[in-house]
Amino acid sequence: MINSSKINLYSYVCSIFIMSIVVISLICSEALQIQQAKEPFRGHLTRVTIQNYNDYLLAIHCKSRDDDLGFHILAKGELFGWKFHVNFRYSTLCFCGFSQRQINKGVFIIYVASRDFYRCANCTWKAEKDGFHGYGDIPTRGYLFYNWLN
């Protein structure tokens, strides 16, 4: 009889231990879901830089769906840049409007995750005479992405 009561006690302690682990796991899972709702998953950090290579002042105004980065005027050689985390759906999009005095040069997509996620973590754009050149993580190799409208 003594052996059977020891087995029952052992079984009871094991059951309590397993139930405790299940309850703690559920509580932790719920807490993690609440924390993720407050602070969603952040993708890798991306840096965008725009540099004016023209002899004139270049006005730029950049935005994303969530942020307005403001209006900036760049003299020749000046830079404007910002950093952001690509969202987990890879739908991050930033665009900028460009002008020279009253002349509209165009509105261009500066970053779209579907195009740029693997192209660059440090995306450099150079405003040159013919248009807007994009450089990826290999800075010596730029491409003309957009021609100026005027």
Curated annotation (Swiss-Prot):
**Superkingdom in the source lineage:** Eukaryota
Location of this chain's protein in the cell: Secreted
**Family to which the UniProt record says this protein belongs:** Belongs to the plant self-incompatibility (S1) protein family.
| Protein name per the record | S-protein homolog 28
Q: Which GO terms describe its cellular component?
A: extracellular region
Do you know which InterPro entries this protein is assigned to? Answer: Self-incomp_S1
**Residues of this chain annotated as glycosylated in UniProt:** 122
Mind listing the GO biological process terms from this record? rejection of self pollen
Record key words, sorted? Glycoprotein, Secreted, Self-incompatibility, Signal
